[in-house]
Design a protein with these regions (language model features):
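Residues within the helices of the helix-turn-helix
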Residues: 13, 24, 53
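A short, Lys/Arg-rich alpha-helix, primarily the initiator
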Residues: 1-21
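Short amphipathic recognition helices of helix-turn-helix/homeodomain-type DNA-binding modules
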Residues: 62-91
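Residue-level detection of the helix-turn-helix DNA-binding "recognition helix"
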Residues: 31, 42, 71
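Short, basic-rich loop-to-helix N-cap that marks the start of a DNA-contacting helix
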Residues: 44-59, 74
Length: 93
């Protein structure tokens, strides 16, 4: 059975619900515009290292958690490279 990969915003959404915080409250805590928080939660904006540190401070977690979730999501959602790359490597070798 394949593991389902979720965007990090889903985990933020769940954490906000568990704490009873709105996106607006979270934006105010982080000192970020509501639009930015909404874009992160909806997977339209990536979590940067700085944002990961801020989220971690607010939730009492490690920034590594948020960076790992972001990187896993990006790797999962990015198309595979052109299959002809190996052919071109062989041509050069």
């Amino acid at each position: 059975m394949a593991t389902q990969i979720l965007p990090p915003g889903e985990f933020i959404r769940e954490e906000l619900e568990a704490r009873g915080w709105s996106q607006a409250t979270f934006a105010r805590i982080l000192g970020r515009p509501l639009q930015t928080i909404n874009q992160i939660i909806n997977g339209k904006k990536a979590i940067t290292a700085q944002t990961a540190k801020e989220i971690a401070a607010a939730f009492g977690t490690s920034p590594d958690v948020w960076m790992n979730l972001e990187m896993t999501w990006q790797l999962h959602s990015t198309p595979e490279p052109d299959g002809r790359i190996l052919d071109r490597v062989r041509q050069v070798a």
